Swiss-Prot record:
Its main location: endoplasmic reticulum. Keywords: ATP-binding, Copper, Endoplasmic reticulum, Ethylene signaling pathway, Kinase, Membrane, Metal-binding, Nucleotide-binding, Phosphoprotein, Receptor, Transferase, Transmembrane, Transmembrane helix, Two-component regulatory system. SUPFAM superfamilies: CheY-like, GAF domain-like, Homodimeric domain of signal transducing histidine kinase. It comes from Oryza sativa subsp. japonica. Ethylene receptor related to bacterial two-component regulators. Acts as a redundant negative regulator of ethylene signaling. This is Ethylene receptor 4. The gene is ETR4. The keyword Ligase does not apply. Residues 184-344 form the GAF domain. One of its GO terms (molecular function) is metal ion binding. The modification Phosphohistidine is found at residue 390.
């Protein structure tokens, strides 16, 4: 401030002196010197303005930085410094204005006041600097200390990162090698010991595992040591000779913790790991879990297994004994042990999956063998069943043919009871023939027909057969027919008759009929749909017919005396229950065949018995559609073919005789041949004069037969004297029913066959077929 005042004083003196020189004594002025002084004054004015602007901007900068930082410790010094700077700036600003108005009294007073205040502020600022400068120096020292600490932290952080990278790199390498080892627990533990010894420069490494059959001992299974004279590592397989107690304090301590433990030099585990000698370096140990997969039994309950651990013991070389185990080394050991545990768990899973796969393969082989045996048994059963059915079919066909002649006698001389017996025999024979066809041909084509039939006639014939079976077995019989039953209904009469006979046969087989103390009862009545709804295990019927329906309840029961009920003992008895048993639960009484038929007919079937076993009953409820209008049952037309010369070729003697009788009944002149070759020889003879040939040849009946019916027909067409003959063949009904592709018709056209008659051959069917063939040709 004193320098500014001196500069202003010198400027004023120079101005006065220059005025004198310019004007001289006579008042004359030099205009060139006047211009230089003016320039200097203008320069001073600009300088004062710039200095004032600079001084006044400094407090603004200080205020800005004061808002960004905490300046509470130097607040007083900063205020003094700001006041000093502001007053200095004001002085320079007023000095700049004095150059334009040098003789203004207010301006001079203001300039004087500003200079005085600036002098006071400068003195106060100078005093404040005595305390401000030491504080500023302390801040600088703290800043340097913080910078040193930051640099050390940065170095430590870099070191930690490098150690982490080195650790992760080592762990990745060890993990990769461990996972690349064979999936076996011993191979994984061996690889772990080898890789840790290589990575940490170990003197020795040992692996202890629980002894098999001795849960209180640990056995040394792997031991790795390095020889001073050999750079290579030697792996020793140690047997049961090296053991350590599982209750050793060091073993218990290692087993109880997940982290690695540093063992003392006098530790029994450390001495045993160094194979008897005192350990030369520091020793560390860590547990490795040997995970086992839970084995589940058939019920799904897991088997409880205790946790099992292996112990990995690591020994440092003697020259590293002073340093010991660092936290970094222990961390590597712990991470590698965790990875080894994961690898062991994977190996356990693979071993379990391999064993399960082997068990499944063995079970699959056993299953395939059982399947093969079952298939062979099924084929054998089917062959036996087909052979039995084929052996029974021809006698049954003969019986059906004979009964058809009895049903249509030349003179109606039969009494009603005889007619009923013949009709019952015919229905039973037809049922047996149809069942054999279903077993052998239509095994997979179980169907239910819906056509009108006489319910009264069906019930009469069923009662007749049931009474006959009861009397033959020595049991009594009682029937209660329902008079209000409809005459004609729509349904499958053959299936209904079959079910009724099965009910009767089931109860008669369960009764000791030889004692004469049993009585069979048969009743039929109309019932409502919801009548049996509240009985146990009731399966409601689903109405499928349209129009008027009727529900018919068939009930067959057997009554026994108490002595017979006590003596009766069967290996498979009805359940002693008073309530009903549905058809789905009666697999031990009725086969699935009957259950399926009942379901297809939209019915229900169950059995019941009393608590004492005296009475049993089987109930069948079926739903029929009423036939609208009266159906006239016209008798079939029996033609009379007078003088028709027929050659019959049949390889079964009984069937040949029955068919011959049927043809003679139709008025034909019949000559029979026992084989196809005999038939061809008769036709080839010159005296043969036949008009029609009936072929009923079956190659299964006579295995040595060289020709079947189609081949014989082809040979007949090749004969010159018999190429015009009419040929009729007899085929099984199931063959025609299942001939979807028309293979039989195609064979008939190719062989020149004029007609087909379905077995069993009956009088009406054969007469109708012969009439059709004669009319067509």
């Amino acid at each position: 401030m004193a320098m500014v005042t001196a500069r202003q004083f010198l400027a004023s003196a120079a101005e006065l002196g220059s005025g004198r020189r310019r004007c001289g004594g006579g008042g004359a002025c030099d205009m060139r010197e006047d211009g230089g002084v003016e320039a200097l004054m203008q320069c001073q004015r600009v300088s004062d303005l710039l200095i004032a602007a600079s001084f006044l901007s400094i407090p603004l900068e200080l205020f800005y930085f004061a808002t960004c930082a905490d300046l509470s410790e130097v607040k007083c010094a900063v205020l003094h410094f700001c006041a000093f700077i502001v007053l200095c700036g004001a002085t320079h600003l007023l000095a700049a204005f004095t150059h334009a108005h040098p003789h203004s009294a207010p301006l001079l007073r203001a300039l004087t006041a500003a200079k005085v205040l600036a002098a006071v502020a400068s003195s106060a600022a100078a005093v404040s600097l005595l305390t401000f400068i030491p504080k500023l120096l302390r801040i600088k020292v703290r800043e340097s200390l913080l910078r040193d600490k930051a640099s050390r932290l940065h170095r430590d952080l870099g070191l930690v990162r490098r150690r982490e990278e080195a650790t992760s790199r080592a762990v990745r390498e060890l993990t990769g090698r461990i996972r690349a080892s064979p999936p076996d627990a011993h191979a994984i533990l061996r690889t772990t010991a080898l890789q840790l010894a290589d990575a940490l420069g170990l003197h020795a490494c040992a692996v202890w595992m629980p002894a098999a059959g001795r849960p209180h001992d640990l056995v040394l299974v792997h031991h790795l040591t390095s020889r001073p004279d050999d750079a290579a590592d030697l792996l020793l397989e140690v047997g049961d000779a090296c053991t350590v107690a599982a209750d050793d304090p060091d073993v218990v301590d290692v087993m109880a913790s997940k982290v690695a433990k540093v063992l003392g030099p006098d530790s029994a585990l450390a001495m045993a790991s160094s194979v008897g000698a005192a350990p030369a370096g520091a020793v560390a140990a860590i547990r490795i879990p040997i995970l086992r997969v839970s084995i589940y039994d058939g019920g799904g309950t897991p088997e409880v297994t205790e946790a099992s651990y292996a112990i990995l013991v690591l020994l440092l070389p003697p020259h590293d004994a002073a340093g010991g185990w660092s936290s970094h080394d222990l961390e590597i050991v712990q991470v590698v042990a965790d990875q080894a545990a994961v690898a062991l768990s994977h190996a356990a899973v693979l071993e379990e999956s391999r064993s399960m796969r082997d068990r499944f393969a063995e079970q699959h082989r056993a299953l395939m063998q059982a399947k093969h045996r079952a298939a062979m048994a099924t084929r054998a059963f089917s062959s036996i069943q087909s052979a039995m059915c084929h052996a029974m079919r021809r006698p049954v066909h003969s019986v059906v043919g004979l009964v058809s002649m009895l049903q249509h006698p030349e003179a109606d001389t039969m009494r009603p009871e005889q007619r009923l017996a013949v009709d019952a025999i015919a229905r039973t024979s037809n049922l047996l023939s149809a069942l054999m066809d279903e077993v052998t041909v239509n095994r997979q084509h179980l169907s239910v027909q819906r056509k009108p039939f006489s319910l009264h006639a069906l019930i009469k014939e069923a009662i007749s057969v049931a009474g006959c079976l009861s009397h033959c077995g020595g049991a009594g019989f009682l029937h209660q027919p329902e008079c209000a039953l409809p005459e004609w209904v729509v349904g499958d009469e053959r299936r209904v008759f079959h079910l009724l006979l099965d009910m009767v046969g089931t109860l008669l087989n369960r009764c000791n009929t030889g004692s004469g103390a049993c009585r069979l009862s048969f009743s039929v009545r109309i019932c409502n749909v919801g009548e049996e709804r509240y009985s146990l295990d009731w399966i409601p019927m689903r109405p499928t017919f349209s129009g008027c329906n009727v529900c018919v309840k068939f009930k067959v029961g057997i009554g026994r005396s108490r002595s017979c009920a006590i003596e009766r003992s069967l290996p498979c008895e009805l359940p002693r229950r008073s309530a009903a048993t549905t058809s789905s639960q009666m697999g031990h009484i009725f086969s699935g065949y009957f259950n399926k038929i009942v379901q297809m007919m939209n019915g229900n079937m169950w059995s019941a018995s009393d608590s004492e076993g005296v009475g049993e009953s089987v109930t069948l409820i079926l739903q029929f559609k009423l036939q609208q209008g009266h159906v006239e049952a016209s008798p079939p037309y029996i033609p009379h073919l007078n003088g028709l010369r027929v050659l019959l070729a049949d390889d079964d003697a009984m069937n040949r005789g029955v068919t011959k009788k049927i043809l003679e009944r139709l008025g034909c002149q019949v000559m029979s041949a026992p084989s196809g070759a005999h038939c061809l020889s008769l036709l080839a003879s010159a005296e043969a004069s036949f008009q029609l040939v009936v072929l009923d040849l079956d190659d299964r009946a006579v295995p040595s037969a060289a020709m079947d019916r189609f081949e014989v027909a082809l040979r007949i067409r090749e004969l010159r004297n018999s190429c015009w003959l009419l040929i009729v063949i007899a085929v099984a009904a199931g063959v025609v029913a299942t001939d979807d592709g028309g293979a039989v018709q195609e064979l008939c056209q190719r062989a020149g066959i004029n007609g087909l008659v379905q077995k069993p051959v009956t009088l009406p069917a054969l007469g109708a077929q012969l009439c059709r063939v004669l009319q067509d040709n």
